[in-house]
Amino acid sequence: MKKLVLFSIITAITVAFGSTQSEIDDLQKQIDRLKKKVSKNNAQSSKDNIKWSVDLRTSIDNINYDMANGTTKGNDSLMSMRLWLNMAYAADSKNIFKGQLSYNKAFGADFGTTSSIMPRGYGMDTFDWVTNEALTDNSIGLRYAYWLYMGDDLFGKGIDWTFSVGRRPSVNGFLANLSQDDRASSPLAHIINVEFDGASAKIDLSNITGINGMSFKVCAGQGSTNAEPLFSTASSYAEDTDALDGISLVGFIFAPYNDGQFIVETSYFQAFSLPDMDIDMETGEQLGFKEYGDIEGAALSVLIDGLTEDGILSETKLFGSFAWSNTMPDDGLAMLGSMDAESGSSYWFGAYVPFGENAKYGTIGAEFNHGSEYWRPFTYAEDTMIGSKLAVRGDAFEINYTYQLTKALSLQARYVSIDYDYTGSNGFFGDTSGASMSIDDVKAGANAWSAMGGTQDPASVKAVVGNLMASGMSQSQAEASAKEMGIASAYLPNIVESSQDFRFYLRYRF
């Protein structure tokens, strides 16, 4: 009897397990069918692997320019809209793609201006270094796109490293991101804040050295390419030996320490074959771009993110930065108006103070920077309507207030003021747009031109020469002085002595 009961129990268990296994097999088949269906659907929708996010900013700027001749220019209500469409895709844990499409336009149509018959989006505002930061037309452009490989065992030593190629995320870098309320991109914004194409490789040294956040990154970029357009000649895309050489840039970023609270970054670069507009100084005729030489630069930037363990100072940010540049002109040519190698420097510091826990009532920021006579960074893409404040040969200050209205919506009020001591802060690298001349000296020369009888009529130079000779100068001295005074008088109406930009924006990010 006991054997019969035991046999019955074993039979029942076997049947039950058999039934359960059958159900499991059926479920697995259903899962496999669903996987095939999902794969088919994903294939039809490009696998739906690119993740999109939106950053839409609508702003109004009140801008003003005080010209060196005493006149003013400006725009009381420059309204614009900027759209960033962000893309991200990870093929696996080591390979990442990131990109950003950009649209940046003033409200309304553009019929050209008296200074240019070309509307916005067809002149220098399409220059590759700033094309997505300038107000252009209704077109959507590519701000950055790159792939990134992330390794974790360099040389078999367990060292983290990365390598990346593409159009770089090189705008709004370290420290400049604070006023922009953005994450910092890679470059130190004190010396590099432009769009460019290139590559980078980074090694994490923290595990080797035991120093928090230590890393070393090498970067290389192409600022311009010398190649004939398609079908413009029989040799499409061949190098034009009579044109400017391609502009290139190499450098490194070394972070000696970063524990999340104390962040120190340094950078050095060299840029080669840099241009400026060649101008006939007698007639003012523009003769096209010309190569003038090379430049090098370096920066040391420090951020303290939190001064105490708790309270308002725990979320306060303080920063300071020092940067240096040095020109290397080609033989017989002048860079920044000088035929000698000239060094320039700049210092920059600021503070950001949140009000309320987690900036419940917003954050106030204040910044100040100063640049010397021959200071020359690559900061053309800095986000103001009045040019780069960090490029100033003089003084600039900024105050801003940022408030998070909702999870997705924020506002900012920002005021930037720039006072120039020298010309050429937002120019290129030669002896025309980039030339550094004391604005006070130019004003004195223009005043002397008028005092000696000079007018806008070129023929008045004879009266100026005669009056100078009557004051005791030789004819050659008088002619040379009259030429300098006449150039100063002609330049004066186009020299900005100070500028201001007040901006208010609403920004949606999700």
Set out the residue ranges of the language-model regions.
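Outer-membrane beta-barrel "beta-signal"
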Residues: L409, S436-S471, S489-F510
